[in-house]
Swiss-Prot record:
It is an enzyme of class 2 (transferase). GO terms for molecular function: acyltransferase activity, transferring groups other than amino-acyl groups. Its EC number is 2.3.1.57. It catalyses: an alkane-alpha,omega-diamine + acetyl-CoA = an N-acetylalkane-alpha,omega-diamine + CoA + H(+); spermine + acetyl-CoA = N(1)-acetylspermine + CoA + H(+). The gene is bltD. Induction: Expression is strongly induced by spermine, but not by agmatine, putrescine or spermidine. GO terms for biological process: spermine catabolic process. Keywords: Acyltransferase, Transferase. CDD domains: NAT_SF (cd04301). It comes from the Bacteria. Disulfide bonds: none annotated. Belongs to the acetyltransferase family. This is Probable spermine N(1)-acetyltransferase.
Amino acid sequence: MSINIKAVTDDNRAAILDLHVSQNQLSYIESTKVCLEDAKECHYYKPVGLYYEGDLVGFAMYGLFPEYDEDNKNGRVWLDRFFIDKHYQGKGLGKKMLKALIQHLAELYKCKRIYLSIFENNIHAIRLYQRFGFQFNGELDFNGEKVMVKEL
């Protein structure tokens, strides 16, 4: 099983822009075009393509944001805008990619926690995150989405 997490570059940008979620997920996540524009405006975001067996199957953004809290004086590591392309959904790739992303972020940032935010009615995604140990912490992000955190 070959899983790769690759930065968005000129070489894969067109393919990244061609990734889409299914129709019923459109209200939960921005398009990759908007995501890449946001990453240009906020240098903390690191947009990546998610590859399985050489095929581009998904997208995510992550980063270390300088939010101070007692246990994480250097900031918070956030996983954001994670999705699997509609053509690859229903094949277990969400689980595989989330596991790989958690491991990648833990190694890259040497962090104690990973944060994400989610719409409270995105039940399928909430269940996935809960299976991987993410729990609601009672916070809301600046968009009013509920914050989940995973202790590493």
